[in-house]
């Protein structure tokens, strides 16, 4: 039978693993297997099943009622030598109020002792001294970068320079973690036939698997968390330069109204083809330009456009255009190959992309709207045309 073991160590670190054992397997041997998996000495383990500690090492697991698919809790016992005999160097414990220390613990209250161990076990790590912890993090760039990545709220409080704010956020997170830990232990100790408790345990295990999967991905494939720039090429429409987005997932080639006005092809728009373009969102189609000339490198290719009223990018080369001219996207050489002519054109680096397509455009650039970008580009084209006209004058 398969037994899932939820292990909580003395330092509050946790691990979950499964063991395949027989029903007549003795508890003593089961402890030994758990020691191999968790690293906790068998003499320090406390195994709990259905809110009942398993103490007789000579009894079999089946005699305790364990069956296939059950979950047991393994906790590391507190030992006298595990508790610090003297204050941790540099830390003052005299001002720390441990819950329940104001009065003598009564023997008839077995539930009172569990809360103090999590607090006292965390003291040696310096978490009881926010000022010291703050100095340690600021002095370690590697740990600080990890904190920014994995705990942005605490990193923000740390870099704010406000010790009181940092202390507040740190204590709130510690209290929340302790609350979740107590809730998790309560769930794993609940009645195994309680459907609600089992559903919460399943969700907790699922979240642990997600976190583990993300941690492995960050270590083994960190590049998967990066962003890539989209594929753009330089081209000309009606003689005017345009940066076109190559999108093999789009059904049709489209152009923004602002770009069509810059290229002076709005006069060719057939408004009988007006409609709604649906994809990730919806856009209003003003009409269609049935035939226009697109220049890619030295090739002049016929193309049709659907004109969209509000579109952040100037032009999008869709599958209709790509299949018509047998284009292929060569990511190894970073080029677009025109199959009918063999012409190759390179995809643009990020520095040459339109502002709306750069990775920097987004969270920190909301103040720049697509229509403002279009107006700016239109002004640049008009200025360039005026300069060329002045140069051609005798």
Swiss-Prot record:
GO cellular component, one term: chromosome
Keywords associated with the record: Aspartyl protease, Chromosome, Cytoplasm, Hydrolase, Protease
CDD domains per record: RP_DDI, Ubl_Ddi1_like
Entry EC number(s): 3.4.23.-
Annotated compartments: Cytoplasm, Cytosol; Chromosome
Positions occupied by motif Ubiquitin-binding: 371-390
Example GO molecular function: aspartic-type endopeptidase activity
Record's protein name: Protein DDI1 homolog 2
Provenance organism: Xenopus tropicalis
């Amino acid at each position: 039978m398969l037994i899932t073991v939820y292990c909580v160590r003395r330092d509050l670190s946790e691990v979950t693993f499964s063991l395949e054992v027989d029903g007549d397997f003795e508890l003593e041997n089961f402890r030994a297997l758990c020691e191999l998996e968790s690293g906790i000495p068998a003499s320090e383990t406390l195994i709990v099943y259905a809110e009942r500690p398993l103490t007789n090492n000579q009894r079999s697991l089946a005699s305790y009622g364990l069956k296939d698919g059950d979950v047991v809790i393994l906790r590391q016992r507190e030992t006298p030598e595990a508790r610090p005999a003297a204050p941790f160097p540099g830390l003052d414990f005299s001002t720390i109020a441990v819950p329940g220390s104001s009065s003598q613990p009564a023997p008839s209250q077995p539930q009172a002792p569990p809360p103090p161990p999590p607090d006292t076990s965390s003291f040696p790590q310096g978490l009881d001294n926010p000022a010291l912890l703050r100095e340690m993090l600021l002095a370690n760039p590697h740990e600080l970068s990890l904190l920014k990545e994995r705990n942005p709220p605490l990193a923000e409080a740390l870099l704010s320079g406000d010790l009181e704010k940092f202390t507040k956020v740190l204590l709130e997170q510690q209290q929340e973690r302790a609350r979740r830990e107590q809730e998790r232990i309560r769930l794993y100790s609940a009645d195994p036939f309680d459907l609600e408790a089992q559903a919460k345990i399943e969700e907790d295990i699922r979240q642990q698997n997600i976190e583990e999967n993300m941690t492995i991905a960050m270590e083994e494939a960190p590049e998967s968390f990066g962003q890539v720039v989209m594929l753009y090429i330089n081209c000309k429409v009606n003689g005017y330069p345009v940066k076109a987005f190559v999108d093999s997932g789009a059904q049709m080639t489209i152009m923004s109204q602002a770009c069509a006005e810059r290229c002076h092809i709005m006069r060719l728009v057939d408004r009988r083809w007006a409609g709604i373009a649906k994809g990730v969102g919806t856009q209003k189609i003003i009409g269609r330009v049935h035939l226009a000339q697109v220049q890619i490198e030295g090739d002049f290719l016929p193309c049709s456009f659907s004109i969209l009223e509000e579109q952040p990018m100037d032009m999008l080369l869709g599958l209709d255009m790509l299949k018509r001219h047998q284009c292929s996207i060569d990511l190894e050489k970073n080029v677009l190959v025109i199959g009918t002519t063999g012409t190759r054109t390179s995809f643009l680096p990020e520095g040459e992309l339109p502002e709306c397509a750069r990775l920097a455009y987004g969270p920190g650039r909301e103040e720049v709207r697509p229509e403002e970008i279009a107006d700016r580009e239109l002004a640049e084209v008009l200025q360039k045309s005026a300069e060329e006209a002045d140069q051609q004058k005798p």
